[in-house]
Amino acid sequence: MGLHSEPLDQEDQDTIILDARAGDLDSLKDIFTTLVSPELLSTCKESESDSTALHMAAANGHIETVRYILETVSRANSAEDLKAFVNEVNKTGNTALHWASLNGKLDVVKLLCDEYEADPFIRNKFGHDAIFEAENSGKEEVETYFLKKYDVEPEDDEEDTQTEGKNSVQITKGTEIEQVTKEATEALREETEKLNINKD
């Protein structure tokens, strides 16, 4: 009897997603060698969020599970389909790289970027790319990796002249969120002033 090759129902997809989330590599290998065609791995999505098995394994730092998922999808699909899978977004616009970055999973981030050319500049629905997620969540090792690999610099960095010579790429920690906070504080202050004026 051959492997199942028809589209999977949601219950079966959720089982695969849960195995990826838990890093249950043995279960995934068993499923995709004895039960289900490997071509279907890239089609599995979590019902609530549209997150893939790759999202789940990457977010939790299960490096061997991530490697297995990528190798399986690579063997069973075209290079174009693999690239689309690596950069696939869920309902909130996050890629697997966003989640690995947010959680500081450096080994997973390196695997995704160095071997599978994951795009760190894809922005989610909040306007954040994977580099911002690493910085914003204080994952300095991941942030440093991104800054060195992609030679990115923060926008409007006024400390360039003071930090020159230390590294080729410098970033003032937290500047993006500081700016957003300043803008929000200013908007709130203006609204408060309007309310006070209206009371008089």
From Swiss-Prot:
A GO BP annotation: ribosomal small subunit export from nucleus
UniProt keyword terms in alphabetical order: ANK repeat, Phosphoprotein, Repeat
Biased composition (Acidic residues): 153-162
A UniProt-annotated Pfam family: Ank_2
Signal peptide region: none
Ranges for region Disordered: 152-173
GO cellular component term, pick one: cytoplasm
One GO MF term: unfolded protein binding
Compositionally biased spans, kind Polar residues: 164-173
Placement of ANK repeats on the sequence: 49-78, 92-121
Domain of life: Eukaryota
Chain ranges passing through the membrane: none
Phosphoserine PTM sites in chain numbering: S78
The protein's role, per its UniProt record: Required for normal rate of cell proliferation.
Additional notes on this entry: Present with 13100 molecules/cell in log phase SD medium.
Listed name of the protein: Ankyrin repeat-containing protein YAR1
Organism expressing this protein natively: Saccharomyces cerevisiae (strain ATCC 204508 / S288c) (Baker's yeast)
Organism classification: Eukaryota, Fungi, Dikarya, Ascomycota, Saccharomycotina
Name of encoding gene: YAR1
